[in-house]
Design a protein with these regions (language model features):
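Single-stranded nucleic acid-binding surfaces, predominantly the OB-fold ssDNA-binding core
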Residues: 1-114
Length: 114
């Protein structure tokens, strides 16, 4: 039996995308996307925010860097990927990111809606 590795998030950017270029010249953008889950209780409503790290490659990376800013609404579809590295203090680190394969700029931001 096969497996499926599919992720989709629709949320708002916590910061403008960061763009860098690999040693081979490939553009890579990193995004931090917030999604909110509404929690209703008897006396109030709160929101639980989850932050998602996303990496975009090539033309998608350049598009994101050129057109997105903090607060913008965006949808990203892709696959989950684990990254491992050693930080500057020698600590082993690991995180899960979404490697974006589809990018939809939804226009507007939280700031514009407020």
């Amino acid at each position: 039996m096969g497996t499926i590795n599919n992720a989709f998030v629709l949320g708002h950017l916590g910061a403008a995308p960061t763009l860098r270029t690999t040693q081979k010249g490939t553009p890579v953008a990193e995004l931090s996307i917030a999604t909110n889950r509404r929690i209703d209780t008897d006396d109030n409503t709160t929101f639980d925010t989850t932050w998602h790290k996303v990496k975009l490659w090539g033309a998608r990376a350049e598009l994101a860097a050129a057109h997105l800013k903090k607060g913008d609404a965006v949808a990203v579809g892709g696959r989950m990927c684990s990254e491992e590295w050693t930080d500057s203090s020698g600590q082993a680190r690991k995180r899960t990111v979404i490697v974006g394969q589809q990018l939809t700029l939804l226009g507007g931001s939280r700031r514009a809606a407020a």
